Amino acid sequence: MTLLASLRDWLKAQQLDAVLLSSRQNKQPHLGISTGSGYVVISRESAHILVDSRYYVEVEARAQGYQLHLLDATNTLTTIVNQIIADEQLQTLGFEGQQVSWETAHRWQSELNAKLVSATPDVLRQIKTPEEVEKIRLACGIADRGAEHIRRFIQAGMSEREIAAELEWFMRQQGAEKASFDTIVASGWRGALPHGKASDKIVAAGEFVTLDFGALYQGYCSDMTRTLLVNGEGVSAESHLLFNVYQIVLQAQLAAISAIRPGVRCQQVDDAARRVITEAGYGDYFGHNTGHAIGIEVHEDPRFSPRDTTTLQPGMLLTVEPGIYLPGQGGVRIEDVVLVTPQGAEVLYAMPKTVLLTGEA
């Protein structure tokens, strides 16, 4: 089913005549570019893109099947949308109420000649098109190569910021537009911080270092986490204080991946990982969800959480990222992006998940 066909089915289900899209993430599949500017209006009969002169030429080359409108001082959002409303005799117009300010919503309510209804079309992004899957697969490939590069690069005596800068630079060389979010590098005791962004801390031999990072490629994100052991004289994985914790996290992650298949509820996948960690005695040290959907945004719905009852379907892409965090000692997290297939699940990363030492060829 095409993007417009899916959206029109959604309009019927929501009992709406049309929808006005204003958020970057919901406009991007229509515009072909990522921008906070411009609007998309989709009715049951027509499709419209409204952009100003900065984006008109670029969007014009991509906007097949859409009527393209130039926004300027005369042709405003209100003018153009009201003309569409009049031409098609629209009665109800959905808008992204969760994405716009109260002031904007109030102004639209008074200026647009249709009944405005807050509606959220985010659900339409849960199942990716084959083209979207391919872009995310390529974004994951960049992250995968980045993980192996940074594993060899890291040495004791480097700062976390130096490591993050090298990783982000390498991913850009591989084709990434930029990092898909602020890179996390958390070594030693900072590994107990689930979102420990890279700091000036110096990594030391024998420490675990958790790297959580991703690449943005053609508007789509990857998200990957590996916990590595910083190499040095006498360093041994098996003798590390958190070696057993690492094995528990890995078992939890593999259990969750094994649970992924069409028809399974998201909460069941979360339970598969959480049960392993809880039975090992670390349930109180795993405080976040097991994973989340990924696409145009790093964090999308549905979530692998205890409360999410969404049923998995082929074409969904989600992360699986359990972790254990021990204050004062450190932590371990392992994360993959997983594609739900008709048969089960496909992990989009190739890097091994055993304890790997840094610096080794």
UniProtKB/Swiss-Prot annotation:
Keywords: Aminopeptidase, Hydrolase, Protease. The keyword Hydrolase applies. CDD domains: APP-like. Its EC number is 3.4.11.-. InterPro entries: Creatin/AminoP/Spt16_N, Creatinase/aminopeptidase-like, Creatinase_N, Pept_M24, Pept_M24_MAP, Peptidase_M24B. One of its GO terms (molecular function) is transition metal ion binding. Pfam families: Creatinase_N, Peptidase_M24. Co(2+), Mn(2+) or Ni(2+). Hydrolyzes the N-terminal methionine when the next amino acid is alanine, proline or serine. The substrate preference for methionyl aminopeptidase activity is Pro > Ala > Ser. Also able to hydrolyze the Xaa-Pro peptide bond when the first amino acid is alanine, asparagine or methionine. Belongs to the peptidase M24 family. This is Aminopeptidase YpdF. It comes from Escherichia coli (strain K12).
